[in-house]
Amino acid sequence: MYVDEAGIDNREEYPYGYCEIGQRFHALKSGKRTERVSWIAALKQGNLFAPMTFIGSCNRDLFQMWLEECLLPQLQPGDIIIIDNASFHRSQTIDEIVAKAGCELWYLPVYSPNLNKIEHWWFVLKNWMRQRWDEFDNFRDCVDAAFKHCPNVFP
């Protein structure tokens, strides 16, 4: 089972343009921070488990709460959780609660998002959201809708 967090904010625009060969394209982009919606979930055999959205970035307390309350109750003893090396994924408490559930934590090599299968889902999910921002009253509703429509979002 692959676990990861991701996030998006509503200023993620990618301007495109043309310029002379050898010249860098420049575009004006606001440096103002906007609302960031993040999420965490697990992927097992092509299905998302325990998706949770939140405002801001993930930290150890939030990750531990998600493990205890959302993910571990859905797992069976012997399940393996594959996760990246984010510093907030590592603590003695996290190791203990995973072991108590009869599961194992396997850490991916440093800087290897290509080995985490859920990263490919995040790419598709973010593109789905970018294409539909204007259809929603607010940004958070767009993110929540993406998870509700997950079976239709992913090939």
Each model region followed by its residue ranges:
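Short, basic/hydrophobic alpha-helical segments
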Residues: L62-I80
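C-terminal anion-handling pockets and recognition modules
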Residues: I118-P155
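RNase H-like polynucleotidyl transferase catalytic core
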Residues: F25-G31, A101-K117
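Extended, low-complexity cationic-aromatic segments
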Residues: M1-E68
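Catalytic-core regions built around general acid/base machinery
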Residues: T93-A101
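Mobile genetic element proteins and their domesticated derivatives, centered on retroelements
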Residues: Y2-D4, A41, L67, D84, ...
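Short, glycine/acidic-enriched loop or turn micro-motifs at the edges of active sites
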Residues: G7, S87-F88
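RNase H-like two-metal-ion nuclease catalytic core shared by retroviral integrases
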Residues: R36, I83-N85, Q92, Y107-W128
